[in-house]
């Protein structure tokens, strides 16, 4: 074994099985590319990305951990989002939630 080496089973790994998902069309109205990471609370992404933010509160991109999606200026694309799990509390990012997601549903 080499230090840091991974030994994984052959085949596919199912991610986020059984979690709530949604699809949303996002358009970059800015003049620069915007990249969003896998675990960023999607409702709090750069304001130049236009979409229904209320619909995606409590969701993140449904992509493998450590990856990202890039939105070029003027680009419109549909993305799939997956609900946050666990304690469902969001802290940081743009500071718009700062606590349990359910407390912000009102």
UniProtKB/Swiss-Prot annotation:
Cellular component per GO, a single term: urease complex
Pathway(s) the chain acts in: Nitrogen metabolism; urea degradation; CO(2) and NH(3) from urea (urease route): step 1/1
Enzyme Commission numbers on file: 3.5.1.5
Keywords, alphabetical: Cytoplasm, Hydrolase
Family matches, as CDD domains: Urease_beta
UniProt cross-references to Gene3D superfamilies, sorted A to Z: Urease, beta subunit (2.10.150.10)
Source taxon at top rank: Bacteria
Catalytic activity: urea + 2 H2O + H(+) = hydrogencarbonate + 2 NH4(+)
Pfam families: Urease_beta
A single BP term in Gene Ontology: urea catabolic process
Gene Ontology molecular function, alphabetical: urease activity
Compartments where found: Cytoplasm
InterPro entries: Urease_beta-like, Urease_betasu_sf, Urease_subunit
Subunit organization: Heterotrimer of UreA (gamma), UreB (beta) and UreC (alpha) subunits. Three heterotrimers associate to form the active enzyme.
Family of the protein in this entry: Belongs to the urease beta subunit family.
Protein's recorded name: Urease subunit beta
Source organism per UniProt: Klebsiella pneumoniae (strain 342)
Gene this protein is translated from: ureB
């Amino acid at each position: 074994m080499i230090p840091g080496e991974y030994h994984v089973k052959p085949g596919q790994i199912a991610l986020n099985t059984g979690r709530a998902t949604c699809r949303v069309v996002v358009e970059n109205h800015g003049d620069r590319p915007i990249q969003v990471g896998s675990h960023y609370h999607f409702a709090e992404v750069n304001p130049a990305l236009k979409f229904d933010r209320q619909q995606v509160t409590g969701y993140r991109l449904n992509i493998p951990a450590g990856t990202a999606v890039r939105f070029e200026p003027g680009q419109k694309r549909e993305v799939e989002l997956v609900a946050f799990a666990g304690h469902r509390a969001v802290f940081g990012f743009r500071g718009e939630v700062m606590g349990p997601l359910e407390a912000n549903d009102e």
